[in-house]
Amino acid sequence: MSLDINQIALHQLIKRDEQNLELVLRDSLLEPTDTVSEMVAELHRVYSAKNKAYGLFSEESELAQALRLQRQGEEDFLAFSRAATGRLRDELAKYPFADGGFVLFCHYRYLAVEYLLICVLNNLSSMRVNENLDINPTHYLDINHADIVARIDLTEWETNPESTRYLTFLKGRVGRKVADFFMDFLGASEGLNAKAQNRGLLQAVDDFTAEAQLDKAERQNVRQQVYSYCNEQLQAGEEIELESLSKELAGVSEVSFTEFAAEKGYELEESFPADRSTLRQLTKFAGSGGGLTINFDAMLLGERIFWDPATDTLTIKGTPPNLRDQLQRRTSGN
């Protein structure tokens, strides 16, 4: 992995009681040893694979102002990280769920792009076997489940300050409160809405195939084409490029897909991140609620699966063998 650490700082927030978070600040930067480099590479890999929200700094953002001064050489990275950890403590202290943790600031370069990663990591307890084959307790950083994470694309921020996607963050497993306090700390607001862009793309594809007067099989083939392209981009860590997608759909209509999307006003960006859960709707129907979970291939609608909107009834002809076996055993038992 072509990842080079420029500077990295680590501090700690310790929760002493319900009201107080204690600051433990390092007096020096971490050395980019092999172990540290391996940890940052793992953080980068895990974070890059997750669905993220996009944001941008507000004009009043204290973090952005301090970061700008640091980038201009008016403050060193360690001082910047120490002051930022203090501001994070002040924000966290407002929330009863605050637990503290290790606060990491890492300025690194990956594939010619500079990033600043800010995250709060926690230790987990586990067991290990030592050289004498004894079992001893141990601790490790829970990188895979870190949810207080943000990353600033410094290259994008400095070369294209009007961008709405230079800052990314995770919304967190415990709901909106995590996102709220972290956004307050960052002094940021939500920017590009990747889910909305993907939903707009799906609607544009459906309308595009309808206007081209394609039959059911042809429409599904187009959806599969779109899904294949978008999934390839997702797997490669690349964004959906409307122009490239339009070339994939050449021949579907006399009008190109990009021209169609622009004329109809879908407000799609020239490129935007793929959203896995939204894109699945191109090839599958899925839903759950009231103790019922249903998931089936889109091509089955109208063939083996029929929906009556008047009665909101779904009729399935031919059940999966394992489901049929369970139903037979349950009904025969009664």
Swiss-Prot record:
User: Where is this protein localized, as stated in its record?
Assistant: Cytoplasm, Nucleoid
Task: Identify the keywords attached in UniProt to this record, alphabetized.
Answer: Cytoplasm
> Which residue spans adopt a coiled-coil conformation according to this UniProt entry?
none
Primary location: cytoplasm
One example of the protein's molecular function in GO is: double-stranded DNA binding
Q: What are the annotated GO cellular component locations?
A: bacterial nucleoid; cytoplasm
Q: Which InterPro entries match?
A: Nucleoid_associated_NdpA (IPR007358)
Family the entry assigns: Belongs to the YejK family.
Specify the protein name. Answer: Nucleoid-associated protein YejK
Q: Which gene encodes it?
A: yejK
